[in-house]
Amino acid sequence: MKYTIISGPTAVGKTDLIIEISTKIGAQIISLDSRQIYKLMDIGTAKPTKEEQQKVKHHLIDHIYPDEYYNAFYFRQDALKLRKQLTKKGIIPLFVGGTGLYIDALVKGFFEGAPKDENIRKHLNKLEKKEPGTLRTMLQKYDPEYALKIHPSDMKRTIRALEVFFKTGKKISELQSQTKISNKYKIIVLTRNRQELYERINTRVEKMIKAGLIDEVEKLLELYPKDINAFQTIGYKELIHYFENKYDLKTAIHLIKRNTRHFARRQLIWLRRYKNAIWINLSEISRRETIEKIEKIINEV
């Protein structure tokens, strides 16, 4: 059996399409969104509404609290467990979302790399103990791409990446990128013409503000410190800076729109790496044709 991943840039219009398709075929959704995973962060992450979630069961949405640590490795474990449970019940799991690291975790897994070297590990631990932050700086120097992927305080993965580098002379990010994509998955990428996508992003940000995003951020700041990883999410970090009087509300909204457009562009660049992905331009075909095309791909053996 082949499983279907449906991805695309933020604001492309995945949610309502997938709700309709899932309702028709009796599927359940496993989210591929690293921000919708947080509880209490609803408006700024564009979570499916309660009504939409009642129509179709969603998994890995509202999964953890904003101050809890989670990464792509944990996601893969949770997603594979859910996939197995749903398949066993005869339910089609649809993987839906635009977080590239989660898609990679699902279709590639994780590079195991060179065997452990206790001498290197002891030396690295000694360096970190002597001067905290040293290993993070080393990783940023030797493998900046991987440093961006992991949490700054994830010492286990930092040490592993440096260990692989010193053992093999190769970056763990490069070795991971060479990992073959599993043939168990079909990837569909939804896209739109650039100007239309950017207009949709701008409109959605305006709707988020009207829906109460400012109040949502204010309430979250009463519960959690401003520097947690979850608050690096676009829409939250800009409004936190607004509350700190770094700029006015008009500037904050402008930055949310701009940063979201930049994010959408990065998502599209990432998705182009999947050479066998099937691209569907929603600007060029009707909704009915889109639904029929996606259903056909899902049903193909």
Curated annotation (Swiss-Prot):
The family assignment reads: Belongs to the IPP transferase family.
Outline the subunit composition.
Monomer.
**What start and end residues bound the annotated signal peptide?**
none
The site annotation (Interaction with substrate tRNA) covers: T99
Query: Any idea what job this protein has?
Result: Catalyzes the transfer of a dimethylallyl group onto the adenine at position 37 in tRNAs that read codons beginning with uridine, leading to the formation of N6-(dimethylallyl)adenosine (i(6)A).
GO:BP terms for this protein?
A: tRNA modification
EC number, UniProt record: 2.5.1.75
Molecular function in Gene Ontology: ATP binding; tRNA dimethylallyltransferase activity
Return the protein name.
tRNA dimethylallyltransferase
User: Which Pfam families does the annotation name?
Assistant: IPPT (PF01715)
Q: What InterPro entries has UniProt attached to this entry?
A: Dimethylallyltransferase, IPT, P-loop_NTPase
The answer to whether the entry has keyword ATP-binding is yes
Q: Which gene produces this protein? A: miaA
Q: What class of enzyme is it?
A: transferase
- Residues given in the record as ATP binding sites: G8, P9, T10, A11, V12, G13, K14, T15
**Keywords, ordered alphabetically:** ATP-binding, Magnesium, Nucleotide-binding, Transferase, tRNA processing
Q: From the UniProt record, list the reaction(s) this protein catalyses.
A: adenosine(37) in tRNA + dimethylallyl diphosphate = N(6)-dimethylallyladenosine(37) in tRNA + diphosphate
Tree of life domain: Bacteria
Cofactor(s) the protein needs? Mg(2+)
Protein residues bound to substrate: T10, A11, V12, G13, K14, T15
Interaction with substrate tRNA, as annotated region: 33-36
